[in-house]
Amino acid sequence: MSAAVACLDYFAAECLVSMSTRAVLHRRATDPEGASAAAVSEVGAVSRESAGKGTGSRGVLWIPPVLQVPTPSPGEGDGAPHLLAASALADLSCGAREDFREDSEEAPCASTSCFEPTWCSSPTGGSEPTQAFFEDELSDAESSCSDSAILDAPEASEEPDDSGEVPEGPPGARPAPSTGPTYRRRQITPASKRHQCSFHGCNKAYYKSSHLKSHQRTHTGERPFSCDWLDCDKKFTRSDELARHYRTHTGEKRFSCPLCPKQFSRSDHLTKHARRHPTYHPDMIEYRGRRRTPRPEPPPPAMVESSGSDSSSSSGQETSFTACL
């Protein structure tokens, strides 16, 4: 019974070893010893051929097979070395698949030297554990992959990054002036007669719109300003004309002559009258309710002659008085 169990365990271990070397070998003879020897020889041959050709998928860790595994005898109660190797292969195969999934998400190693198969011979005595050997191989492979990845890493580009930093210019250069919106003062143009009459054949233009409206009433005949005096139905086109007419009813004469006591109700009548005086000057007349400073009037010629005679007589008296003394 123990021999049958040992044979089944050995066959399972053989299957694991063959699966790890990717060799399809399913030969089982009647004699377990002969079968084990044939399997070991076939496994060694296939693995050597694959190692010589250098085949193997990139990115997957290749695990070297355990060669020349001794066949357990029916008398021995435990096939510890062979079963330990099989269990190590099973654990490492699971670990290799997990590592491959992690490496597929990250950047793969650039160099292929980290996956080259290496040959080694297991101890015949079976006292040294095989699992420690595979752990050392895995650690060496990972370290070689990391070193090659660091060596093959691209150098940092010397181009300036987009971090927002402004490269420094020459020491004597000044920063460029800001190109913001510049406000210019509006040029003051001289006043022009922009308000032109729109009636056909009339080319008159005015500075103010109110003047244009009063002028257009001459074309339309409109007279919106009417006198409200009793029994007076006169109408006017301008308000100043109405005010002038209203003074005829009240008898107000606010424009007085500066050279005589006469008064007038209209400023043009006053100007016409003042020009008749020989000593008249335009600054003497009130202008829009304000009297301008009049020029000093020259004395009349009779007064000048009399003052000259008085001074000459007084000087003669003084000379005679001094002569008498």
UniProtKB/Swiss-Prot annotation:
Residues 306-316 have a biased composition (Low complexity). Its main location: nucleus. Residues 153-196, 270-325 are annotated as: Disordered. It comes from the Eukaryota. The keyword Metal-binding applies. Residues 183-196 have a biased composition (Basic residues). One of its GO terms (cellular component) is nucleus. GO terms for molecular function: chromatin binding; DNA binding; sequence-specific double-stranded DNA binding; zinc ion binding. It is found in: Nucleus. SUPFAM superfamilies: beta-beta-alpha zinc fingers (SSF57667). Residues 155-165 have a biased composition (Acidic residues). Keywords: DNA-binding, Metal-binding, Nucleus, Repeat, Transcription, Transcription regulation, Zinc, Zinc-finger. One of its GO terms (biological process) is positive regulation of transcription by RNA polymerase II. A zinc finger (C2H2-type) spans 195-224, 225-254, 255-282. Pfam families: zf-C2H2 (PF00096). CDD domains: KLF14_N. Belongs to the Sp1 C2H2-type zinc-finger protein family. This is Krueppel-like factor 14. It comes from Mus musculus. The lineage of its organism: Eukaryota, Metazoa, Chordata, Craniata, Vertebrata.
